[in-house]
Swiss-Prot record:
GO terms for molecular function: hydrolase activity. Its EC number is 3.2.2.-. This is Putative ADP-ribosyl glycohydrolase L543. Belongs to the ADP-ribosylglycohydrolase family. It is an enzyme of class 3 (hydrolase). Keywords: Hydrolase. It comes from the Viruses.
Length: 330
């Protein structure tokens, strides 16, 4: 096994966690407020500070990262993605009194069985295109870093992603959307550069007929400050709007970052400066940039996550403790 692949997988996970934790400080802010806070906190040069709307500890992460840990725990123990065991872990998380939970997630994970989660997703979440479904994939894709690249491996990862997505999202577009992101992440972990990952994503978007991705690729390639999807035009200055959880914004920021940045820190700071769903947006791009630019994640940010002391939360959800989940890292 190539040690660099293992390093990229490890830093994809850490990059996601750092992005989530950093972004949580600015969650739900407007663009101007986010920019002012970044300057006030000296762009987190001394480490992550927590706080935010939920009063988090420095280095503490949010709900979807905790959910990603549920996936990691199953893959670590069994070596593969087991939908039934993951569903059990998801429900355990739901019962842990999380400090935040989105409506889409609550609708499904409040059910106590895999089949009931899928039924609830079909009943209540058909219209949801929320971004947490992509965010938690950093707990899945990097865990298979040591699989030999092949069409069989691609199908294996695609199946796992699809099985995970349907636990919370039943919109038929969300499966391909998640698969495209997941395969881009795996591609980066295997050592492909940002340009190749960007082009690979576009090929996947064409292959799986993802109108959302194709529209966003057109926007990024043309350097527009908007993209069109389902007869609606989305503008860059709407990222902090009431529709901030739309997965399209997360994908847009990710693809813009791939074209613009070659450094983890700069990409994450710019994403957060837009305000809105800063934790999720930074996490989704953070995983990809952690794999691509693994040596550019500020060590002080990684240390903040690895040394987090959210002891009260660990009592209800023990696997959020770095002493536990750090043992599962590649």
């Amino acid at each position: 096994m190539n040690n660099m692949i293992e390093l990229r997988a490890r830093n994809a996970i850490l990059g996601a966690m750092v992005g989530d934790s950093l972004g949580s400080t600015f969650e739900f802010t407007k663009q101007k407020q986010a920019a002012n806070k970044l300057a006030q906190y000296n762009y987190l040069s001394d480490g992550l500070i927590g706080k935010g709307p939920f009063g988090l500890k420095p280095g503490q992460f949010t709900d979807d990262t905790e959910i990603a840990l549920a996936i990691m725990s199953v893959i670590h123990e069994y070596g593969y993605y087991d939908q039934y065991r993951v569903a059990e872990k998801y429900h355990e998380w739901y019962n842990s009194n999380p400090f935040d939970i989105g409506n889409t997630t609550k609708n499904s994970l409040s059910q106590n069985s895999c089949s009931d989660m899928i039924k609830a997703s079909r009943k209540y979440n058909f219209g949801s295109m929320s971004n947490g479904s992509l965010m938690r994939l950093f707990g899945l894709v990097p865990m298979f870093y040591d699989r030999v690249p092949s069409s069989r491996t691609t199908k294996f990862i695609m199946k796992a992603i699809q099985q995970d997505i349907i636990l919370t999202h039943s919109n038929p577009e969300m499966g391909p959307i998640a698969i495209i992101y997941g395969l881009m992440l795996w591609h980066a972990i295997q050592g492909h550069n940002a340009s190749n990952v960007y082009k690979y994503g576009k090929l996947l978007a064409e292959k799986y007929h993802s109108d959302l991705y194709l529209s966003i690729y057109l926007s990024v390639d043309s350097e527009y400050d908007f993209f069109d999807y389902n007869d609606t035009r989305y503008h860059l200055n709407q990222i902090d709007s009431s529709n901030f959880g739309f997965v399209g914004f997360s994908i847009w920021l990710m693809l813009r970052s791939l074209k613009k940045h070659s450094d983890y820190r700069n990409a994450i700071i710019e994403i957060v400066s837009h305000g809105g769903d800063t934790d999720t947006n930074a996490c989704i791009t953070g995983a990809l940039f952690g794999a691509l630019y693994y040596n550019t994640i500020p060590s002080v940010w990684i240390d903040s996550v690895l040394n987090c002391q959210a002891t009260e939360r660990y009592q209800n959800y023990p696997i959020a403790n770095p002493k536990i989940w750090s043992q599962w890292l590649p």
